[in-house]
Amino acid sequence: MKINRKGGLFLLMFLFLLTGCWDRRELEHVLFINTLGIDFKDNHYIIYPQFINFTNMAKQEGPANRNYSPAYIGKGEGKLLYDAAFDFYKSSQQKVSWEHIKSIVVTERFLKNGNLNQLNDFLSRFFQFRNTMWVFGTKEPLENILATNNIFNISSLYTIMNLPQETIRQSASVDPLRLYTFRSNYYEPGMTTRIPFLATTTEHWKQGHKAFWMLEFNEYGCIAAKSYVNHLNDSDIAGVRWTNKNTNRAPLLLKVKNRAIGELILKKPKIDTKVSIEKGKPHIVMNISLEGDIYQLMKPMPVHKVKKTLRISLKKK
């Protein structure tokens, strides 16, 4: 019995050596950045961290009752990106976490005039950044992009800025870009990186009779040899989807003499590229084959004629 008591006292002494979770923080006491906007103006880097309310994402057993909670947008400014981050800290009321950033949005002004090497250094050295973040560009003020809401008071987390792959599965209008792809292409001399550009629009949605702002993809910005080259608009990128092996589903309007005759859904492009040098210049020939479904034809048409019309339409793209 004495041995058991001595053993118990011996074990009790070790309890005082155990560490506790004294530095643990409750989730509501930490500010989690959802999207990070980066701009460049008057030789200063400006960051715009976007914060969202996670309570609108909670699962409810009864009828959904989502209370409207707009995104909160911070701002920091400095000669360097790190300096801008510490400038933002001055007004932060709680600890800020950079570990769960879903996407980065940079302005065209930053791509043209900012230091892209500094951006890569900023994202590489800070251990909380993840390489799986989505990368976007924009020509619009970042406040407009980051403040755009979602329908039914659904969290801003569920937008194309954070989940672009959801809409791409239904209609492949753009090829979303991950940070690890951007960084790997950035150091390749022969690679051109296409950054999808975001814009706001009121053309497609209304809340009752009131125009409702939503995000959309509208063009690409191109980077080559570590410098911003130019942007490509809707008409310029019309054929890009057919050169992307990840295109799962994309529509094509069939036309004959500028008259719409049908709608096809094309998918799973197979691309065979051949490169040759002629008179000292490279020539590239691409043979593309796709699977497709005919969704609508305005009048009966043989399959071989549909294929012929399709080939003509694709070449024009």
UniProtKB/Swiss-Prot annotation:
Main location class: membrane
Keywords assigned by UniProt, alphabetized: Cell membrane, Germination, Lipoprotein, Membrane, Palmitate, Plasmid, Signal, Virulence
Membrane-protein topology: Lipid-anchor
Lipid-anchored residues (S-diacylglycerol cysteine): C21
Lineage of the organism: Bacteria, Bacillati, Bacillota, Bacilli, Bacillales
Lipid attachment in record (N-palmitoyl cysteine): C21
Keyword Cell membrane: yes
GO cellular component: plasma membrane
Superkingdom assignment: Bacteria
Function field: May allow B.anthracis to germinate within phagocytic cells and therefore involved in virulence.
PROSITE patterns associated with the record: PROKAR_LIPOPROTEIN
Protein family according to the UniProt entry: Belongs to the GerABKC lipoprotein family.
InterPro entries: Spore_GerAC-like, Spore_GerAC-like_C
First and last residue of the signal peptide: 1-20
Gene Ontology terms describing biological process: spore germination
Full protein name: Spore germination protein XC
Record's subcellular location: Cell membrane
